[in-house]
């Protein structure tokens, strides 16, 4: 439940910040009449992401066992790529993003009689990107942790992000977004490492990967996945009490370079947003 909550909170907050920046700029430049056009783009993006998620989730249940394992492995790999890109993209986000959004709004509103649709599409693509990232991650997370709690966590995370987005827009709160994105990014790298190990396990069960399947270690006597804490660790980080050598290797092969890259200072001119 916690991982879907955190991911949807983060992704939802990113989308909320984009919408908030656009809405604030429209209001500041006395073009508030375009607000309804902006919300059309937001709703279209939300409908696309929701529809795609439901379609994929419903159709995969009809796959034979091996094909389903293969699909789960592919989704996990896509989720790892998306999460990693999301973490390092955010590190490169600077205050120029606000300027770029404002320039994009100006450009969209200056395209003659069709400026309304131009703004709709601009907002649509900006929000849909965040939503599509969430779709693939949630598909991987729901496969790793079944039951009602992961979807509930995702909905709570999204609802929290929406509330925070409105409060930020109205000026009711100020958040240290730099610290928020920094610590959630670090957490997400560990989640992605667990997904990477889970992808190898899924590919093995699909019959595609049969190398290094010896048990690396057995922690069942110390931290069983049948215990409360073990279940939480499995749901959050993909913990396995008796992982194979290939799962452990993939976990380290992904995580160590990712942590090193994350610890390095961002390139000059690319500083993360501090607050809003």
Swiss-Prot record:
GO MF entries: ferrous iron transmembrane transporter activity
Endoplasmic reticulum among keywords: no
Main localization category: membrane
Cytoplasmic side, ranges: 23-35, 91-118, 169-179, 266-276
Subcellular location as annotated: Cell inner membrane
Species name: Escherichia coli (strain K12)
InterPro entries: EfeU/FTR1-like, FTR1/Fip1/EfeU
Transmembrane segments: 2-22, 36-56, 70-90, 119-139, 148-168, 180-200, 245-265
Membrane topology: Multi-pass membrane protein
Superkingdom classification of source: Bacteria
Stated name of the protein: Putative inactive ferrous iron permease EfeU
Membership in a protein family: Belongs to the oxidase-dependent Fe transporter (OFeT) (TC 9.A.10.1) family.
NCBIfam families on file: EfeU (NF041756), EfeU/Ftr1 family ferrous iron transporter subunit (TIGR00145)
Record has Cytoplasm as a keyword: no
Quaternary structure annotation from Swiss-Prot or TrEMBL: Part of a ferrous iron transporter composed of EfeU, EfeO and EfeB. However, this EfeUOB tripartite iron transporter is defective in E.coli strain K12 due to a frameshift mutation in EfeU.
GO biological process, one term: iron ion transmembrane transport
Keyword vocabulary terms for this entry: Cell inner membrane, Cell membrane, Membrane, Transmembrane, Transmembrane helix
One CC-aspect GO term: high-affinity iron permease complex
Side Periplasmic, residues: 1, 57-69, 140-147, 201-244
